[in-house]
């Protein structure tokens, strides 16, 4: 008896150990893969491109670090698949389900049996049975051999969006997948048929936020300041009924036809005893919330700050004191302020006229604010988050960066921010016993510094607007005053400090070299050759390593060896890729990157906190040919110049853009940066020369 108990105890312990850790929103962090690296993914990553088994989309997603495996979410999906394939042992061996890290609502079936369910789908479905239908549909695509995996038409933009555009199934294939999925796989499960309306609604409105909640003015205003009424819409655009929309305008076409046919297929099938949930409903709700947090994190990486702000606002209605949401909101407002300051308004949000529903109020408000209002509102958000988490180094660095933007770059002064609520009169201040004496004008930087340390409160001014009242509750904070003083004083010494910092940095003995992103496009905006781009990136990385070695600095390259993959290495690789995406989406902005802290562990492990990253785009310039310059000189020498004329006319310049950046991955600061953009014929040589020169300049300092 005792032996039996010991065996059962041991088996229970082994089972518990084998289970992935439970995902939680209380201490949410970017989701990492768990367990052993899956053999199907290893096989896919190492399949030769010449093979019929090669899966370009899967390999692309894997090498971008977008695949998640081995987590509690994956196990939840596997349990559903097990029920769908209970009578199909062969398919049980062939189907492998993974999660694709993107907020886009979709799922994909690939020819090798891989099924990818997006994080966006997990965030939007309303019950487990809806997920079962989605998986049954994708498995049917595979069993009916509908799958195709072709990235030859890849264009600029998010690779998942491109794949969705290029890989749409025909109407007949979609209908077949619904029929086979329902009658061959879904029918064998205990899941309810009543969910069909729900899942087709999820697909029909897949571009909408997690929920529709009015965006209240109190979200961006307080009792002591108010924006003008014209910063807000009186009514927002209603979300129209999409059931009669033209299919080509929808992300998921044929929805209404599919809905009608699917409901017809199961109309006469018994539904008694079938359920929306087979696994615990509480687990589904928790995992869906985790998926929503993960989508918000991806919005931040993509710099889709309007989506990040609104969806964070939605989630805060349920989790009002969540540390991650508080930080995410601060990050989103900060990122929006940095883009606004650089004039890149359209890069971080959709035009409000293109937005439907309650989110339109937010986008309209973001459209109305000026750069000072953006910066100060962002500072308010960051300061609030910092009060709750005072040891958060990222928030500290972001707050200091915003203070520098406000008081140095935007040239606002400490006395530009009132200590009294908007609308307070001098009479009210006097009646309350306050001092209504105005300080003398500050004519020098020393006067400004002294005024910032004065105990006298800043009084209302007829010229003040809402922005001048936005720091009432922060203005007298001793830490805030100290950071403002530091920003003002340091601005006067910036050149000296920069030199000192460069000297210190120049003494680094090692540097991380991220694999460059090198993208070459043809005249139609399509990627010419991923293989050529990879080769160019590898050659550029080798050149960067040589430049560092010349100065006895050890280059540390970090890439993923998929021939011997390990999960810990893959998770670090994912973090690096997320940072790459964050950097690229910033468009060259000097800002504290949301993903910088992801690299802290990598920096500690590899022994360097400096990271050099290069992003290159190479596109044909349709408007410029070198022949325009040379032909007038060559025509008089015709016909002797004919070979030269033909050669010159065959040359076509390319528009080359190079972003060069050296980042301190611990505090997120940019140590060196450069941007190169011009029309070139011999562009590869110029790119290599520019990057080599920038590294030389950096290390010689």
Q: Where are the predicted features?
A:
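Active-site-proximal beta-strand/loop segments in catalytic clefts of secreted hydrolases
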Residues: 100-102, 119-120, 199, 514-517, ...
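Bacterial Sec-dependent N-terminal signal peptides
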Residues: 1-26
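A Zn2+-metalloprotease active-site environment signal
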Residues: 19-499
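C-terminal/domain-edge helix-coil "capping" segments
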Residues: 174, 478, 483-523, 601, ...
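Start-of-domain marker
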Residues: 33-40, 69-70, 499-549
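Short, solvent-exposed beta-strand-terminating loops
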Residues: 145-150, 333-340, 558-564, 618-631
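Short helix/strand-bridging catalytic loops that position acidic/His residues to coordinate divalent metals
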Residues: 157-169, 527-531, 633-635, 641-643, ...
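N-terminal segment of the mature soluble domain
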Residues: 524-617, 665-669, 673-675
